[in-house]
């Protein structure tokens, strides 16, 4: 400011020009320029090179003295939106905000070098003064447990589910190592770009904000309408930013729904309240002792006679209400406490909450309060926990009974590469016995093979899991009526013989307009299945195919040209393939599929003798809604193969819900199209 005044610069004109270039209020810039008591005033930070160039041109054109550009450093996020809520960002002052940036700011920041010297009353250096130099310290490097490939796969499948089911309020999910507590992926969608953290990433929200801004700017400045509109715009902008920065996996509680049944059944088996042969009967609804209203199962016609395994496979609310009564309020509450539901997980991220559970008396004093809280709580309703709390608890059920402290930072290195901190798995406490854990692994796997989660199947992998569908009981419409919005979820575990990875996917408010039945089994289970199909091979989990699921095995075609018919057929047979022969001759002269293409196990390969097939491309049909037979016929007519993923039952109700190649994509004949099958009926 002092330099500008001495140069007799046209400060109002400078303020207008800089305001236009920087997108800032010219009046505010003029106020900064008028503060001549300060040596300098900062009016812009983190400006890009294009903007800096415009300012340089303006300075040179006008010959202005008193405007300076200083090079600075800033954090660059090359992965952009990937894991944005986990990583966080640094603000204009290079301070860590949100996520890892906030939690580990003291390690990442380092310290700035400085010179301590004497100044005159105009903040200018004095002659013959002393100077003391303090060296800078580089910040440490923080190494995350996140795997970029796994994170990208999780976000890709959540995004696909949002589009497929017209999900209204985003999605969240995570991938954790069951044995260590390491977080391999953690996602909240919609996301944002930490490089542009102040920009609203959601286009609809951004458009609404722009309209609010346009409306208030159209009012006379200083008028009541102008000021009210400006305030409302500022509040809405702030709320939108906070929403997109929020990590729902650790910060937001939600009703877990039927995924919580894993914990209830584990507790009841562990203390002997039930065994595998305990009988139940579900008629669709029942007047449970201690409840004012009849309890309804999700299946209105009921499940009939069941034993413990079927109660979990069918996700039967009536059976679980009786399990809760057998367990009793005291034991139920103590197991819930042991599972970590009443406490934060301790993850090394800023902003973790612990959800909201019942007051102990509501569960234990059933003489006074009835059994509504106890029985509803047994199947995950009328309380809230965070997604991470749930995943940590279920991981303990399948890993032998050890409740782990999840972590996101594996190691911290100083500027010289020396280890400052190295994370190790931390066991908090035991939740259930190893014997109970072994039993539960078998039961959880049966939910995928025989129960409500068949849509999560991935050929060649042993997968277990539990579906969940919960109502958002605290959401109301403009008339104060409770809406029927739902969160659908699925927790999947693999491989079940020795669990390593646990994956949660949750979709917040799928639209009814799609006509697809809204449930965790229909929507979230195939989403997790798709994540597993992507990441399990990458993580080194080996596939093992039985004769029943050989069609799910992908076989890379070898080059059979030059082989005799006998040798080619013998090689194909070893791979679980058959051959059809076209033409005559001693050796193979061509083949469909071509060498290097993949085909499902059990497929037929076309071998040419004495002729070479002309290269041919075909358009991929729209398989959506077809059952297995229809899809097979449509593919076969075009010389295509199909790889079945998801629900492998052959039924008219099990249909294609997704395909890896869009309709009308041109592909070579012999290409394998991956189809996701799911039972979308209620």
Predicted regions and their residues:
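Ligand-recognition elements built from short beta-strands and adjacent flexible loops
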Residues: 423, 460, 464, 474, ...
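Beta-lactam-recognizing serine transpeptidase/beta-lactamase-like catalytic domain environment
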Residues: 120-133, 171, 179-258, 263-507, ...
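Short, glycine-anchored, charge-dense loop/turn motifs used at functional sites
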Residues: 1, 154, 176-184
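Second-shell loop/turn segments in exported
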Residues: 1-8, 15-18, 37-46, 87-91, ...
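Small/polar-residue-rich segments within soluble enzyme cores
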Residues: 4-9, 13-21, 27-139, 481-482, ...
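Acidic/histidine-enriched alpha-helical segments
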Residues: 27-38, 74, 167-180, 281-285, ...
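Solvent-exposed, polar/charged alpha-helical surfaces in well-ordered, non-transmembrane soluble domains
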Residues: 9-16, 20, 27, 45, ...
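Conserved, well-ordered alpha-helix/loop/beta-strand core segments that scaffold catalytic motifs
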Residues: 40, 127-171
């Amino acid at each position: 400011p002092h330099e500008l005044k001495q140069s007799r610069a046209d400060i109002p004109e400078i303020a207008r020009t800089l305001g236009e270039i920087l997108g800032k209020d010219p009046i505010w810039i003029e106020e900064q320029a008028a503060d001549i008591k300060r040596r300098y005033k900062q009016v812009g930070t983190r400006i890009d090179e294009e903007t800096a160039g415009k300012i340089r041109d303006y300075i040179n054109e006008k010959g202005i003295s008193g405007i300076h550009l200083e090079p600075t450093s800033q954090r660059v996020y090359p992965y952009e939106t990937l894991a944005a809520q986990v990583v966080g960002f640094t603000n204009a002052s290079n301070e860590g905000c949100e996520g890892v940036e906030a939690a580990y700011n003291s390690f990442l920041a380092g310290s700035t070098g400085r010179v301590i010297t004497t100044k005159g009353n105009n903040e200018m250096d004095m002659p013959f003064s002393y100077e003391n130099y303090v060296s800078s310290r580089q910040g440490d490097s923080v190494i995350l447990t996140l795997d970029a490939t796994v994170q990208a796969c999780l976000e890709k499948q959540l995004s696909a589910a949002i589009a497929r089911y017209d999900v209204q309020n985003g999605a969240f999910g995570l991938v954790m190592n069951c044995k260590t507590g390491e977080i391999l992926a953690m996602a909240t969608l919609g996301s944002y770009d930490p490089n542009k953290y102040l920009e609203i990433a959601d286009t609809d929200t951004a458009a609404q904000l722009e309209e609010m801004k346009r409306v208030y700017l159209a009012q006379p400045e200083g008028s009541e309408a102008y000021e009210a509109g400006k305030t409302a715009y500022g509040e809405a902008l702030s709320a939108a930013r906070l929403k997109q920065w929020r990590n729902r996996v650790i910060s937001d509680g939600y009703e877990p729904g039927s995924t919580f049944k894993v914990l209830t059944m584990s507790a009841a088996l562990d203390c002997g309240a039930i065994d595998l042969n305990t009988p139940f009967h579900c008629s669709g609804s029942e007047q449970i002792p201690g409840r004012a209203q009849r309890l309804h199962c999700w299946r209105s016609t009921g499940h009939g006679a069941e034993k413990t395994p079927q109660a979990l496979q069918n996700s039967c609310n009536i059976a679980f209400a009786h399990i809760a009564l057998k367990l009793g309020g005291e034991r139920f509450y103590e197991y819930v406490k042991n599972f970590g539901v009443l406490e934060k997980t301790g993850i090394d991220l800023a902003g973790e909450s612990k959800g909201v559970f019942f007051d102990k008396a509501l569960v234990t004093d059933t003489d006074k309060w009835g059994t509504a809280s106890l029985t509803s709580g047994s199947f995950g309703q009328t309380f809230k926990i965070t997604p991470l709390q749930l995943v940590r608890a279920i991981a303990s059920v399948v890993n032998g009974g050890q409740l782990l402290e999840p972590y996101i930072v594996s190691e911290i290195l100083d500027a010289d590469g020396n280890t400052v901190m190295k994370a190790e798995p931390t066991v908090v406490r035991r939740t259930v016995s190893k014997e109970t854990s072994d039993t539960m692994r078998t039961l959880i796997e049966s939910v995928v093979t025989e129960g409500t989660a068949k849509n999560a199947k991935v050929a060649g992998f042993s997968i277990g899991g539990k579906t969940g569908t919960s109502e958002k009981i605290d959401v109301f419409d403009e008339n104060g009526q409770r809406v029927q919005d739902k969160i659908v979820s699925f927790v999947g575990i693999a491989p079940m013989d020795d669990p390593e990875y646990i994956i949660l996917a949750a979709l917040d408010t799928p639209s009814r307009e799609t006509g697809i039945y809204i449930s965790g089994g229909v929507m979230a289970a195939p989403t997790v299945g798709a994540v597993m199909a992507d990441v399990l091979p990458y993580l080194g989990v080996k596939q093992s195919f039985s004769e029943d699921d050989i069609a799910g095995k992908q076989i890379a075609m070898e080059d059979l040209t030059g082989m005799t018919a006998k040798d080619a057929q013998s090689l194909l047979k070893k791979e679980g393939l058959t051959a059809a022969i076209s033409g005559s001759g001693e050796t193979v002269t061509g083949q469909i599929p071509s060498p290097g293409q993949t085909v499902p196990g059990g497929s037929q390969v076309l071998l040419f003798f004495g002729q070479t097939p002309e290269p041919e491309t075909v358009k991929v049909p729209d398989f959506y809604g077809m059952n297995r037979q229809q899809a097979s016929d449509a593919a076969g007519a075009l010389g295509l193969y199909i790889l079945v993923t998801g629900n492998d039952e052959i039924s008219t109700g099990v249909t294609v819900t997704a395909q890896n190649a869009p309709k009308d994509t041109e592909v070579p004949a012999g290409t394998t199209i991956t189809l996701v099958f799911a039972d979308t009926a209620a």
